[in-house]
Amino acid sequence: LKVFGFPLRGWSRTPKAIEGVEGFAGEAQFADFLKGTDILVNLLPLTPETAGILNYQTFRGLRRDGLDGGPVVINAARGGHQREADLVRALTDGTLRAASLDVFEVEPLPQDSPLWALPNCFITPHIAAASTETTGVAYFSKVIRAHEAGGPLPNLVDVQRGY
């Protein structure tokens, strides 16, 4: 989004310093983060704390005077983050201009879901992060080499945090 002139803002559980990104952290800064956000891209891990975070209250907190027609939500993380009834409400009452959803509370998205009928809801079949066999093998080989060399393994799950 930066190449299109959008300022970048990020929110996480703990403070982070990322060059070119205005950072917000913790529950206390969530509302301030939303107030300046036109396009909300969710890539959070799904934990008990983030389940249902994409809800009507969150959508109402997004910046109202930025994008023509209102804010946009993109969820490419986990379906458990969103409350689809709240998405339908926000997309039909104008709280959200649009949504792009790659994940759903129930997958595949049921044929009778009202999301299918909304012209401002763009649906993809859980393919936001497609991998090729070549990239998969290259990554796996890198992990094996690191393990054999006694080095640290990448992307280990912290079971206490849930991701």
Question: What is each of the regions a protein language model found here?
Answer:
Residues 6-7:
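Residues at the starts of beta-strands that form the adenosine-phosphate
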Residues 11:
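The conserved SAM/SAH-binding core of class I Rossmann-like methyltransferase domains
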Residues 15-114:
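Rossmann-like adenosine-cofactor binding region
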Residues 17, 107-163:
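C-terminal helix-to-coil terminal segments
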